Amino acid sequence: MQALACYLKGKDKKLAPSIKAYIEHSLQKLDYSHELDFSALQTTGQVYDLKNMYQALNEEYFDQPLGLHITWFGEKRRSVGKRVTFGLFHDPLRLIKINRLLDNRHFPDYFVAYVIYHEMLHYVCPTYVDEKGQKHIHSKAFKEQEKKFKYFKDAQQWIRENQQYLFEGSY
């Protein structure tokens, strides 16, 4: 409370690490998944079925159903030189969003599964703020869990081998 009072009074210009940690922790408790328009979620693509892939990963890697939702987002094509985000996890909606670019035979199924698994881990190993106020999105626990994905090395190698292709936007 002391740190918050000092910040609000203008004595401190930066948020104290304890306030940042409290905010991050509180945000993770939010659950707006009931606000989702489930009819708008698109899980069936031309090549991949996200719902089936998500369910298979949930059964294989997690002790209990995570209760997350999944959908495609974005366009099938992108402009050359633009940054690509393969997937996102929106915590308050409990929603995994996978870039529609991945619904393409050029992207192997193990790579698409890896992206889904990675986003699932954002729920299992949430972001936290340390005692210095530094935000950690991919914690040590997250990275350890990520390496348990059976095609982790294959997915990492595929990224390395296809970097030029990914940045050209020629898919």
Where in this protein do the model-derived segments appear?
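Active-site-proximal or metal-binding-adjacent scaffold patches in catalytic folds
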Residues: 1-113, 123-171
